[in-house]
Amino acid sequence: GSVRTKYGTRNELITAVAALQQAGIKVYVDVVLNHMGGAVEKEKVMVRRVNPDNRNEFTSDPFEIEAYTKFTFPGRNGKYSRFIWDYHCFSGVDYAANLDETAIFSIVNNPYGEGWEDLVDNEKGNYDYLMYCDIEFRNPAVREELKRWGKWLYDTLHYDGFRLDAVKHISPKFFNEWLDAMRNEIDPELFAVGEYWSPGNLPLLLKYIEATGGRMSLFDACLQ
């Protein structure tokens, strides 16, 4: 980016990771792949309103909104990636700028499938959508860009593993493909632990571990 963040510079981060590893401490990066926020451009998108308590229930016919779904990262000028995130990369949004309305909107002009992705649980009907621009993992270009990004991040930081955010909202099929790619490219023993927030439901956590073929551990949310 073009502006230093409050968390320090890139070089400070690289130095901190190296210092931790030299002290025998493994570094796991906190990876958020479920959603994106802060787009710089609006696009006209066909959507349907969604019942927030049952995400499989659509409460309107398709209609057009203006949504912040185009991420061009102008400050980077294509330095790290020339991939452009637009509405084809997302399955839903939560804000219609032209209406100044906050709600859950399912994107319907989507060549990769109607509605939401298949998950292992039926909480809220389908809990694929969490917030902001929900990433569309059925789009093969998105999956390839996230693999490229994971490899770039490793080449930059040389991390030891992942803490995967909000995995309950992401299809296990994606993580099977992505983690296999990361381990093939980086290290077969690359560690991964997922945050599947479902306190008191151990069988559901075990179901997700089974669906991902043991590729990741999960935090024991039941202890909370």
For each of these PLM feature ranges, what is it?
Residues 47-126:
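Core domains of carbohydrate- and sulfate-ester-processing enzymes
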